[in-house]
């Protein structure tokens, strides 16, 4: 575990190169050819997946179970986790699941939240930044795809922002909602309403995918073709 301060002049523990999957070195065809069939799970075409989620666990056990299942799915596919750096709630659940499975965890957290979202030992490598804006930008830069578990205002803002970035052509990375027990039905209904009323182009309804469980969602992310 290594914590970098925003005042640290040189951070060597984490590779700063963008986590971009190029057509030349990590194409879908190569990923399929290099499929890891252990447990019937294919190795992913992603190096790192960013997970947005709550610093609370929610009232349903299914939310925590989904976070753990997602972490195990990433480990099975040999995908690193990028997340908000906290040890509480669903953030802690998914990070612990990845670390306990032998996967690599990269957390990005503002200095002001260290005392609020971290208790005890941090999970994996922690990159400490100066602001929420830096946190979101760094998480996005390091990731090849995005997943939103259930969460509150912060989670909703984070996932909607990366969908908006896709709409603006800022990135072409897959975005997925892990719709546990219909948690994101309201957001799906909102998007359908916005499309019907002319605020979102029909083609942009497909800027993200959703599924009720981690294996199904990750499969959709793997198959995603940018709009």
From Swiss-Prot:
Keyword Ubl conjugation: no
Tissue distribution: Expressed in roots, leaves and stems.
GO MF terms, alphabetically ordered: cytokinin riboside 5'-monophosphate phosphoribohydrolase activity
Listed EC numbers: 3.2.2.n1
Residues annotated as binding substrate: 117, 135-136, 152-158
Skewed-composition ranges (Polar residues): 1-15
Span list, region Disordered: 1-26
Catalytic reaction annotation: N(6)-(dimethylallyl)adenosine 5'-phosphate + H2O = N(6)-dimethylallyladenine + D-ribose 5-phosphate; 9-ribosyl-trans-zeatin 5'-phosphate + H2O = trans-zeatin + D-ribose 5-phosphate
Keyword vocabulary terms for this entry: Cytokinin biosynthesis, Hydrolase
GO-annotated biological processes: cytokinin biosynthetic process
Domain of life of the native organism: Eukaryota
GO CC terms of this entry: cytosol; nucleus
PANTHER family, per the entry: CYTOKININ RIBOSIDE 5'-MONOPHOSPHATE PHOSPHORIBOHYDROLASE LOG5, LOG FAMILY PROTEIN YJL055W
Protein function: Cytokinin-activating enzyme working in the direct activation pathway. Phosphoribohydrolase that converts inactive cytokinin nucleotides to the biologically active free-base forms.
Family as reported in the entry's similarity comment: Belongs to the LOG family.
Protein name: Probable cytokinin riboside 5'-monophosphate phosphoribohydrolase LOGL9
Lineage: Eukaryota, Viridiplantae, Streptophyta, Embryophyta, Tracheophyta
Originating gene: LOGL9
């Amino acid at each position: 575990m290594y914590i970098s301060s925003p005042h640290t002049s040189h951070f060597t523990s984490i590779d700063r190169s963008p986590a971009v999957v190029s057509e030349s070195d990590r194409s879908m065809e190569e990923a399929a050819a290099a499929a890891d069939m252990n447990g019937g799970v294919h190795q992913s075409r992603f190096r790192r997946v960013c997970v947005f989620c709550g610093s609370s666990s929610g009232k349903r056990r299914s939310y925590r179970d989904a976070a753990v299942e997602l972490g195990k799915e990433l480990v099975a596919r040999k995908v690193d986790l990028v997340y908000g750096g906290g040890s509480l709630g669903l953030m802690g659940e998914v990070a612990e699941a990845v670390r306990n499975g032998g996967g690599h965890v990269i957390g990005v957290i503002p200095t002001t939240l260290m005392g609020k979202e971290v208790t005890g030992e941090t999970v994996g490598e922690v990159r400490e930044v100066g602001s929420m804006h830096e946190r979101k930008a760094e998480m996005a830069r390091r990731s090849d795809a995005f997943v939103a578990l259930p969460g509150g205002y912060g989670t909703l803002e984070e996932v909607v922002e990366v969908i908006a970035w896709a709409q603006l052509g800022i990135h072409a990375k897959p975005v997925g909602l892990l719709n546990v027990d219909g948690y994101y039905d309201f957001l799906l209904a909102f998007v359908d309403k916005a499309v019907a009323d002319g605020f979102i182009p029909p083609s942009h309804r497909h800027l993200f995918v959703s599924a009720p469980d981690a294996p199904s969602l990750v499969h959709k992310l793997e198959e995603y073709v940018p709009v």
